[in-house]
C-alpha cells in the first residue's frame, strides 16, 4: 500500500486513519467479506481497510470527500477495480450509487458525523443488509 505521509489531516473532516495492520486484519475478519458481497465503504481514507476487503468481494464502491485522498487511492495498484466516488456520503443515496443492493456498509467515521451517518443509514434501510461502523 502507498502511504501518503505528507497528507495533511483535515480538521474540518475529522480525519484520522487506521494504520495498525493487526487491527485492520481483525476488522476485515469481523466483516468477513464474501465473493457475493457488494461493499459500500464510507471514507476509505488511504485505503488500508479497502485493500483487505476488495480482493474478496464482487464489487466495492468507496465514497470519499477529500480530493487529495482520491488521488492517493487511484494510484494504488491493488485498488484498480475499486469504484471511487468523490463526494459527501450524506449527500448520496445508496440506490443511486453504481453498486447493486443490498450492500454491506463499512466505514471508519469521524466522531463528529456519527449521528448524521447513523440517521442516513436508517433512512436507507431497504438498500443495505449490515453495517460495520468504527467511530474515531
Where are the language model's segments positioned?
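Catalytic cores of RNA-modifying enzymes
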Residues: 1-135
Amino acid at each position: 500500500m502507498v502511504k501518503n505521509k505528507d497528507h495533511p489531516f483535515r480538521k474540518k473532516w475529522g480525519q484520522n486513519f487506521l494504520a495498525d495492520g493487526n487491527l485492520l486484519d481483525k476488522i476485515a475478519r469481523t466483516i468477513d467479506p464474501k465473493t457475493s458481497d457488494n461493499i459500500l465503504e464510507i471514507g476509505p481514507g488511504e485505503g488500508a481497510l479497502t485493500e483487505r476487503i476488495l480482493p474478496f468481494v464482487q464489487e466495492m464502491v468507496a465514497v470519499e470527500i477529500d480530493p487529495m485522498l482520491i488521488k492517493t487511492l487511484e494510484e494504488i495498484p491493488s485498488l484498480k477495480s475499486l469504484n471511487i466516488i468523490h463526494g459527501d456520503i450524506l449527500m448520496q443515496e445508496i440506490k443511486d450509487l453504481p453498486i447493486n443492493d443490498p450492500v454491506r456498509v463499512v466505514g471508519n467515521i469521524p466522531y463528529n458525523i456519527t449521528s448524521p451517518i447513523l440517521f442516513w443509514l436508517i433512512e436507507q434501510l431497504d438498500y443495505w443488509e449490515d453495517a460495520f461502523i468504527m467511530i474515531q
